Amino acid sequence: MPKFYCDYCDTYLTHDSPSVRKTHCSGRKHKENVRDYYQKWMEEQAQSLIDKTTTAFQQGRIPPNLFSAPPLGGPMIPPPHPSMMGPPPPGMMPVGPPPGMRMPMGGHMPMMPGPPMMRPLPHPMMVPTRPVMPRPDR
């Protein structure tokens, strides 16, 4: 009879049946081994990302600080007007008024309605019913 091998636990089960696998997979040691396996995998992925970022930085492909302020005394360039930037990328909602529409006096955008709020479903209630009476034969 074929045996079932558990990669997480590095062990063979007594035999390959659904009940044996279910019992094994619901056990404390198996769950710990699965958790440890994925924890180790996540740490390896994080370390790989750190190494790639460090290598790219050392090769000069990443600037020293992406979010640095402009140098003191340097020119302050205002952000472009929203209508000058062109359409938003696909899947993004446009920000600001449509092209050709001016802002209202005071410079504030009117509040745009958001998606409708979902109300919580009412709790099911017991509906009183009359007892069913047997009908007399007609």
From Swiss-Prot:
Residues 62-99 are annotated as: Disordered. It is found in: Nucleus. A zinc finger (Matrin-type) spans 4-36. PROSITE patterns: ZF_MATRIN. Residues 72-99 have a biased composition (Pro residues). The modification Phosphoserine is found at S17. GO terms for biological process: mRNA 5'-splice site recognition; spliceosomal snRNP assembly. Its main location: nucleus. The keyword Oxidoreductase does not apply. InterPro entries: Matrin/U1-C_Znf_C2H2 (IPR000690), Matrin/U1-like-C_Znf_C2H2 (IPR003604), U1-CZ_Znf_C2H2 (IPR013085), U1_snRNP-C (IPR017340), Znf_C2H2_sf (IPR036236). The keyword Electron transport does not apply. The modification N6-acetyllysine is found at K52. GO terms for cellular component: commitment complex; U1 snRNP; U2-type prespliceosome. Component of the spliceosomal U1 snRNP, which is essential for recognition of the pre-mRNA 5' splice-site and the subsequent assembly of the spliceosome. SNRPC/U1-C is directly involved in initial 5' splice-site recognition for both constitutive and regulated alternative splicing. The interaction with the 5' splice-site seems to precede base-pairing between the pre-mRNA and the U1 snRNA. Stimulates commitment or early (E) complex formation by stabilizing the base pairing of the 5' end of the U1 snRNA and the 5' splice-site region. Component of the U1 snRNP. The U1 snRNP is composed of the U1 snRNA and the 7 core Sm proteins SNRPB, SNRPD1, SNRPD2, SNRPD3, SNRPE, SNRPF and SNRPG that assemble in a heptameric protein ring on the Sm site of the small nuclear RNA to form the core snRNP, and at least 3 U1 snRNP-specific proteins SNRNP70/U1-70K, SNRPA/U1-A and SNRPC/U1-C. SNRPC/U1-C interacts with U1 snRNA and the 5' splice-site region of the pre-mRNA. Interacts (via N-terminus) with TIA1 (via C-terminus); thereby promoting spliceosomal U1 snRNP recruitment to 5' splice sites. Belongs to the U1 small nuclear ribonucleoprotein C family. This is U1 small nuclear ribonucleoprotein C. It comes from Monodelphis domestica (Gray short-tailed opossum).
